[in-house]
Swiss-Prot record:
It catalyses: Endonucleolytic cleavage of RNA, removing extra 3' nucleotides from tRNA precursor, generating 3' termini of tRNAs. A 3'-hydroxy group is left at the tRNA terminus and a 5'-phosphoryl group is left at the trailer molecule. Zn(2+) 2 binds at residues 67-68, 211, 269. It is an enzyme of class 3 (hydrolase). GO terms for molecular function: 3'-tRNA processing endoribonuclease activity; zinc ion binding. InterPro entries: Metallo-B-lactamas (IPR001279), RibonucZ/Hydroxyglut_hydro (IPR036866), RNase_Z/BN (IPR013471). It comes from Geobacillus sp. (strain WCH70). PANTHER family: ZINC PHOSPHODIESTERASE ELAC PROTEIN 1 (PTHR46018:SF2). Its EC number is 3.1.26.11. This is Ribonuclease Z. Binds 2 Zn(2+) ions. Zinc phosphodiesterase, which displays some tRNA 3'-processing endonuclease activity. Probably involved in tRNA maturation, by removing a 3'-trailer from precursor tRNA. Coiled coil: none annotated. Homodimer. The active site is at residue 67.
Amino acid sequence: MELLFLGTGAGVPAKERNVSSIALQLLEERGATWLFDCGEATQHQILHTSIRPRRIENIFITHLHGDHIFGLPGLLGSRSFQGGDTPLTIYGPKGIQAFIEISLSVSYTRLKYDLQVVEIEEGTIFEDERFLVIAKQLDHGIPSYGFRVVEKDLPGTLLVDKLKVLGIRPGPIYQQIKLGKTVQLDNGTVIDGRDFVGPPQKGRIVTILGDTRYCEASVELAKEADVLVHEATFAAEDSALAHDYFHSTAVQAAEVAKLAGVKRLILTHISSRYQGVLSEELLEQARKLFPNTELASDFSSFIIPRKK
């Protein structure tokens, strides 16, 4: 599991930072990539990475401001042109379906793959046997969502030595036992699979928030997350501007991280007024309150290790 930042700027493209897009690489977990937001030129940013558009499985849109969605039509079309034929689902606020349908229609773009668009409300918006995604609305003046990506716990290690003591040899029965099922052996003995499996491996939690002021929903979504990705559009001294424009300061992002008990905070969505040394000052402001904070730049990559 890896977070790869494709765009870390705010509002409009800048020389140092493109507009918002984050890739959650789940290659080991499901052979796929999930995108969070798709600002202008996201597909161009992808060209500088190892991401393959045909492997993009889901796209989660936080809100409908242009710096978070204007890259969608081009990426969708190019994915088809480059031979992508696997289904793709886009999750986003009400209005995202109209935006996509109109963009593709007026440009005569024909997709060769199945595209599903889901207009979301608060609650569980995605779930399968491995992952769960929960959405909550934030505070941004227009509907803006944060996403809590939960990897479900994995079964514990099969205690092979313990099975061999009972004379149970490797075979299909091992899979049944690893799933914790009750199994009857050839000699009639009944064993409880749970007695032969180690403790479950705790899944990881990644919280990615859209644009927002400080709000309780941010804290709830980030509760005990392994990683919190939070916007830091403004410095602490510009907190009045942050409030007026429905954004957060780096210090407010750190406050959310501390209250939520997260392990790691990554700052993104940085205004172009803070370039070079000034952006490092945002990082230092956050670290005074939450030391395990990092500042994302375009193409920054962060590995999220499994819990021990």
